[in-house]
């Protein structure tokens, strides 16, 4: 009986550790994407979609990101629910909230070369945050879930060229 209690305690501690990693990774990724978005050099495809939704429907960037992610999560749930776990949902809630928080406190230079380095820092932080989140192994992000759901159900290969 003691072994069972100890095992459950270890599992709970491991889960809590992973959830903390997801939250930290989400915060770092959100800060990174916010730096990159507002540096003034344009954005990636999804960031442009978020900006368009935000302007069209008078939403914040974080809320637009959340709306797109919910749509992708719903698609992945219908198409291949094995891609979605607690980490998928937790990441998106923390990430979208933090994007809105960080968007209110960004300060940029009038020098484009300096903003370029801010954008690079943002991309690096986004990658680090995403890596942290992924290392917890508690579900894919909404965008990755759709990619892997489509790939696995259709026998497509996801690879680096």
Roles of regions detected by a PLM:
Residues 2-161:
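Core subunits and conserved enzymes of cellular information-processing
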